[in-house]
């Protein structure tokens, strides 16, 4: 076991400031090569308008080496929000915001892929293109609802030529088609306009999946700016076509920017099975309200008051910095659905690129969706837990297994025998007590990222830092750290989980922050802290404490683009000895993800 901690004491290389995570940076608003004013509505003649220059170029090393092997992304071009995932007649459907024209934001349509296992995907022609007055500016994010009788319906936001937003509806053209390739927009679109007093017509988007209220009428929520508040506005309908606004929002707040991509669903404490919103909700269930705001996905746990027709959070926090997060990294615009095949709730998020705009143009692609995760409510009813769907384990091969390891201060244990660029690692850390833990400062909850940056892996602590060093070059000038620090708060532990990218690459022009989040640890109930990290070339997803904190990171080490090799280690740099009862790792095979699209781009 090597004593090789000198690498962590090196000056931070290319430390970037904590760049603001604007949803659409300024570079994506410029002209697009091959852009058009409209798109064909015929699924048999969809035009991609791809730049001939991009098509004729030999793929660059960055295009191939940084492209993921088992994450969802189209063969090329721009992708952002997941929209309307569902399971229907034997297939999972993943719709997504997609630019047919290139790897920059614009000309958005609804991409469409299908799968039988959530791992391997068949790419189809776009389900929705911008070809009507109410969506000529773009077919923006929305949801799918399964109506009584098994009729799926898409409700989505469209923008008109003046960029005013409204909600539109489409039905499958042929329900007997197992892929549901073609969708027909209703003639009276848009079905919902922002006509009520106090509404902003350019901040009215992203309708949720519908649910049925106690009166038998449909409900749905739409993200909006309303009388200066951020709100999930509530609407009712008897037929899912004609909607009226309820005189109060589902929930609103006066301290954040507009809420995008709201999600609302029922959960049972301690039950990792999902609940179908179209069925009766069992007694004791709670509800989760998620909103995408300021480049992160935040949520609250509470109850859906049927009499008031409103969401009531269990804990009201005026400071939104204290709201819980779905993911503490590069993760946004998540969307969940009830998986009737396996009786679970599954969630996806969009992970944007954090390299430069010129890198995206060189690669010819930008963005991906995270690994689908099962999401449920923990036993105490306070927070959501997430874990990669079991199906992803079908890609595992070449397992290595270590048991009974002991990591002393300064120890590095190299994990050999797997592809370090495509790996799944599960490791348990065992703590005997909190005796060596440093005191916890509650103010750290306001900015865990800053605390990860100040207390990096090179800063020795009482208990921790301990965790993984991944994607490390031979000379350690490039490496990413995923680790824990344990603090003591009264009689419980407070665990800080960090994914530190500040030394992840020698390349210039990258965003390389230190992401982080806290979770509680009760040593009387559990003696171990689990860490699972999936490495997929430029995407790293980590799950700490059984999914209490999840962090998605995008990394672009030069060693990967150069075709070099990388190393992976378990480490401890804290005063307390950390035991590792089990460490397992696998190489991950490549999935078949939209490799052969089921349609021709002319």
From Swiss-Prot:
Disulfide bonds join 452-498. Pfam families: Glyco_hydro_32C, Glyco_hydro_32N. Inhibited by sucrose. Residues 1-19 form the signal peptide. It catalyses: Hydrolysis of terminal, non-reducing (2->1)-linked beta-D-fructofuranose residues in fructans. Detected in leaves, with maximum levels at the leaf tip. Its EC number is 3.2.1.153. Induction: In the first section of the leaf sheath expression decreases after 7 days of cold treatment. In the second section of the leaf sheath expression increases upon cold treatment. In the thrid section of the leaf sheath and the first section from the leaf blade expression increases in the first 4 days of cold treatment before returning to its original levels. In the leaf tip expression decreases after 2 days of cold treatment. It is an enzyme of class 3 (hydrolase). SMART domains: Glyco_32. Keywords: Disulfide bond, Glycoprotein, Glycosidase, Hydrolase, Signal. This is Fructan 1-exohydrolase. It comes from Bromus pictus (Patagonian grass). The gene is 1-FEHa.
